[in-house]
Amino acid sequence: MENSNPLAKIEDVSFRYPKSDADALSGVSLEIPRGSFFALLGPNGAGKTTLLRLLCGRFAKFSGTIELADDVRGANAFLDPIACGILLENPGIYPKLSINEYVDYFVGFYAARIPEWNDAEARERIASLAKSLELPSLDTRMGKLSLGNRQKVQLLRAMAPAPRLLILDEPVANLDPMSRETVWKLIADWRRQEGGTAIVCSHILAEMEEEATDFAIIDRGHVLKSGRVADIASETATFRVEVRGNLAAGKTPESLTPEKIRDILAAAGIEAEVAPAQSSLSRLYRETV
């Protein structure tokens, strides 16, 4: 996958957790296009979260290289926490803090490090995000929130500084279908309005693929496939044959083209339509993993 101005370029990255006898990641090479919705796919334990943690600078020792664009790179050569909204699995909460107090903690962190920070604009943005996410009163204590609302608060916190990049690990975990739809729309609107880039892991592929522009399928630490979602149809072209009448069972050689199939059936007096079958990220995932 090539991009003239990628936001991140990962080359031959391998990583092994201490005391483990197997690599969590092995020879991973990817490019994250700027402005993309990058879907990181794979079964549990595939290495998706490990890769996100590496991008976030959680592990300093690994082999290979990770190159980041200047506008998202921090002083330590890893992602700048100011330019990036990060939501990893199982974030800690402070049960005695209200939503407002919890978010205020991070607002203070951002305000101290972003020279152009405008507190009034930030407050307006946070209020708008809270409304879009249908959160309860911001005076509600974190410990009294449902798991779904805690997840929404974490997304609010990640989006509070108007980041250029979102890294989201299972952003719709513990959410009901309507809330999941709200979250996907919020991320899509942010991308369109801000030109941001999102790197997202989610097990609910059928929902995520509606917004995904690029993808990588990882299993057992290896990248099995990656590319642009728009290219899937041309790379995995198959055809559906709709037969009107009875067709005797038999083997169909792979070399048969749609035209040949249509001609053979027509010669046998069978009317049929041969049309491209709809290819999708979900289908490619099922065929790959």
Show the residue positions of the predicted features.
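The feature captures the beta-strand-to-loop junction immediately N-terminal to the Walker
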Residues: 41-43
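Catalytic Walker B motif of ABC-type/P-loop ATPase nucleotide-binding domains
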Residues: 166-170
